[in-house]
């Protein structure tokens, strides 16, 4: 039985869902959250379980190409990120004009023939568009000064067709031939979502397996040389470069077993061995996996990576806010906590593959604020997609989800002095960081307050998630509770 002692209770109020069950606010009132003293409550006296560093931080996803250009070539780079580190976190916990994030996830930084970088040509080098390895190490050093951790995208499943391994593998006599999956004839088995996965190679008239498209051939993880090589790649980035961990792309597809091409027992087992491998190098290494499927299947990977993205939860938060259906949000969190009771999962609203939140909400800032409140005060490790905090918009195709960051209202949005690699969103003159800095009621400052609140309260980072009953379905009410720290969130 738990024992309890008295503690102060912090109450968060947010006037969007509440407005559905009460008279509407005047148009001049800007919805925001308020922190006020409330009646004391009881909390457990038992010591909380120790948490890992990633459970104590808010992450920020950066597409390097689109974040900040330092040299005028129109392409974001490592030096550009360095220039903006103080915006992300100035390293001083007493200040509140930075965003307050504690870790960065950099989308692929390896050399690649594509703009996005998910078809790698060299696993132990950086994309020259972004700078040199020395530039990247400088970024790591500057981030460390501010207590910012840095993880990178690790594309384990496939390479580019331009990778030297694949080029060599086209020769059936090459020792690299079995690094990929080849067939003399075209198998008729469709891919996991009924797509074509066997692609003809003009150089040898054979067919190779690639689950995503013909420019990304899958590596053959049945080959022990491939498995050993990817362990060496992992070790390189941890020991020789010094990153803090990895976001694992396309984790579901490493091994096929007959006609089953995703979530096989061999894939799940490999990740468990991989985790043991990198923890032996540095127990503080962090990995988060992209396992884009339902919660039940995602949970099978929980022993192979430190955290996993909750795609169903993201949809339930966004759509629950859209429809003013708090019950959907609460039920989704409860489902996740059934499989991850320690809260060791990753929450987000959108990423580089999904419609931006502000586009979903039709530029409704109030709904964007509420969605932010829900996931930044909820359990799990939050991941913010760059530009989300200022309400950048973006709809498919993918290039439009990854446009340059909107820093100012000048002709190039403060992103570059040259020609941006991709046009900015047309609304950048009205939606930009410089403009939102000036008004305390903007989405940007709402994000700042929420992140700093989360940083200040252990209950938000690792406390119990206790939904409270309400006679109004539109009211979102939960208690976050950890030892003497308690927060009541009502929206």
Predicted feature descriptions by range:
Residues 16, 21-47:
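Ser/Thr-rich, Proline-interspersed low-complexity disordered segments
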Residues 44-49, 193, 232, 293-297, ...:
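Alpha-helical scaffolding within the catalytic cores
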Residues 54, 275-281, 286, 292-293, ...:
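Loop/helix patches that line or flank the sugar-binding groove of alpha-linked glycan CAZymes
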Residues 167-212, 216, 319-338, 402-429:
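Core domains of carbohydrate- and sulfate-ester-processing enzymes
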Residues 117-126, 306-316, 400-403:
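Short glycine/proline- and charge-enriched loop/turn segments
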Residues 96, 101, 242-243, 305, ...:
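A structural motif
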Residues 21-23, 47-228, 235, 251-296, ...:
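Acidic/aromatic-lined carbohydrate-recognition and catalytic surfaces
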Residues 2-10:
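Bacterial N-terminal signal peptides that target proteins for export
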